[in-house]
Amino acid sequence: MSKAHVVGLGKSGVAAARLLKREGWEVVLSDRNTSDTLLKQQQELAKEQITVELGYSLDFAGALPDLIVVSPGVPWDIPALVKARELGIETIGEMELAWRHLKSLPWVGITGTNGKTTTTALIAAIFQAAGFDAPACGNIGYAACEVALAATPPDWIIGEMSSYQIESSLTLAPHISIWTTFTPDHLARHKTLENYYDIKAKLLRQSHLQVFNGDDAYLSKIGASHWPDAYWTSVKGKDYLIGDKGFYIEDGWVVEQLQPNSSPQRIVAAEALRMVGAHNLQNLLMAVAAARLADIPPNAIDKAVREFPGVAHRLEHICTWQGIDFINDSKATNYDAAEVGLASVKSPVILIAGGEAKPGDDAAWLAKIQGQTSAVLLIGNAAPAFAQRLQEIGYSNYEIVETMEQAVRRSLDLAKHHQAPVVLLSPACASFDQYPNFEARGDHFRQLCLELVGS
């Protein structure tokens, strides 16, 4: 019996282990961590004849596995995986494993620094409104291998794909791929901007059809010279399209130009989307592009867009208390996303920011803080460094409050004092200093806000 080793006991790792077991592999699933939750998972998976090793880091002292499958959170270049590849052990990511089981189906792959979750969710909603079984998976919704485990295969697979997942997927080739934005992020893992770009570009190069956000500064700069056959989008109108085919906003409508010589066609009114911000119009254009390239009719697109509620943790309206809106933008884990968050809400804002800082250019974000906020509450490891940056630009109305509990309590007082209509959690940071992920951070913010309203 062939032996497989799955690294990482998260949702993706467990789904990969179950899929391999179903296919007849002898499976070991390992995680370097230990906890009561993981011990419980270990016991449950033992009933399925899946061995789980906790507190274990991959080594090659014993019999070598035939296959190693890596969860998205595990760096591709850790010494153990580098050695595995040197030893000739086939090493792939969980997304690649799912692709190998589902490649007979059409995929839409969505990647990008920011905007991919909203775009993925909206594409899935549109395809489902058109009558397709089209689950969102990957970095959102189901693990890709969970979709592969389903008794009945779907019609389409709508996959949000991080750079981590693309890096470990060697043959993944969606029918349609979308690149939402590109700015410095995850450089601690990918080292250089060029390497980060090349990883994401691989997904698009291996796809049949490509869609790009033409309003993104970096993507538009490399534009048609790199991607001459792609479809481009622009919220600014037809004159701003790169190339001669794509999707754009004109007179309040999403308009398609599928071929250079075809007549432009109105697809859906831009106001049908309830989500605020120019960035969400960009997301709308890319979602409509995917739908039209899959021959979905405008009436299904219109229905889905009008009913689309938005995405948790991305400018999510939690509640209104004494005329103050509390908004959860926990998914803003870098400066660009946080800048967009500030630009998308009413001002002046009481901003809650901080966490585990990432490399990047903070100048535009700081300028937005100066123009849009009445006060800034700083939490997490980044608080002292952020305070220093605010001092350097002459902004003094900040407080280091350290925890989310203190930030939410203090935000109400400050909002009343400054007559600010919005309290916004938009951290510009990863969450790992205080929370396991940005979802847990956003959930905690939501809980605290609702407790405040109920008190």
Swiss-Prot record:
Q: What is its EC number?
A: 6.3.2.9
Q: Which GO terms describe its biological process?
A: cell division; cell wall organization; peptidoglycan biosynthetic process; regulation of cell shape
What does the entry list as the binding residues for ATP? 112-118
Any one Pfam family match given in the protein's UniProt record, by short name: Mur_ligase_M
**What compartments host this protein?**
Cytoplasm
Broadest EC class assigned to this enzyme = ligase
Q: In which pathway does it act?
A: Cell wall biogenesis; peptidoglycan biosynthesis
Q: Which reaction does it catalyse?
A: UDP-N-acetyl-alpha-D-muramoyl-L-alanine + D-glutamate + ATP = UDP-N-acetyl-alpha-D-muramoyl-L-alanyl-D-glutamate + ADP + phosphate + H(+)
Instruction: Give GO MF terms, alphabetically.
Output: ATP binding; UDP-N-acetylmuramoylalanine-D-glutamate ligase activity
Q: Cite the Gene3D superfamilies for this sequence.
A: Mur ligase, C-terminal domain (3.90.190.20), Mur-like, catalytic domain (3.40.1190.10), NAD(P)-binding Rossmann-like Domain (3.40.50.720)
* Alphabetical keyword list: ATP-binding, Cell cycle, Cell division, Cell shape, Cell wall biogenesis/degradation, Cytoplasm, Ligase, Nucleotide-binding, Peptidoglycan synthesis
A GO cellular component entry from the record = cytoplasm
Q: Which family does it belong to?
A: Belongs to the MurCDEF family.
* Chain's role: Cell wall formation. Catalyzes the addition of glutamate to the nucleotide precursor UDP-N-acetylmuramoyl-L-alanine (UMA).
Q: What is this protein called?
A: UDP-N-acetylmuramoylalanine--D-glutamate ligase
UniProt source species: Trichormus variabilis (strain ATCC 29413 / PCC 7937)
